[in-house]
Amino acid sequence: MNTKSKHLVFLTGAGMSVESGFKTFRGADGLWENYPVAQVATHEGWEANPTLVTEFYNMLRQKLFDAQPNEGHRLIAQLEERFRVTVITQNVDNLHECAGSSEVVHLHGELSKVCSSRDPYNPHFIRQLTATDAVITPGTKAEDGSLLRPFIVFFGEAVPMMDAAMALTAQADLFGVIGTSLNVYPAAGLINFVPRGVPIIIIDPEPISTTVNGGITQIQKGASEGMKELVETLLPRLFHNN
């Protein structure tokens, strides 16, 4: 059997990156790095104070460039030696790419990029940043004359990569969920697009609650330990010819 004939699709969330020391999620108190989410992660917040928003993401971006992929990221990337692997991530970091994953769909944008505030998804106005130019001076303009804004899907904005994510999920031979509680929509709805009979593996140290019936196996561990169990124990059992 051609080992690349099987398609593994992973949906990853904040718990995937926490072992790398990078936190890109809001707490139960509605704060993100001590800032109210409404101020730094909404279109209204951007319109009201683009300087604050630019400086907030400068801070996060500098933390990102100090972070390193963890064993969980690396194990997912290594599976590409034997399978087609797609990562659909709710995270705005680029740690999957740093670990070597080649097919990554970012649902909520990418912290390492900035874009036009007038035409955010025009590729001509999207700029990739590096550790040496991670800080954007507030007021810097894109090539179309609008302010550069973080290439982030703010709360309340449409998720443009969702259709692609649904189509990829519908092709899965295995669907893995790592580090997300499945209560962030629309991403949480992806589990409903998994073909009938396809195994669903959820890696999360907390007990899961999902309305999908049957076919779900939980590995109640963190991302790295859970991925190790998936690779060493579950995958050989599920795809023994691979």
Residue ranges of each PLM-predicted region?
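Conserved catalytic core of sirtuin-type NAD+-dependent deacylases
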Residues: M1-N242
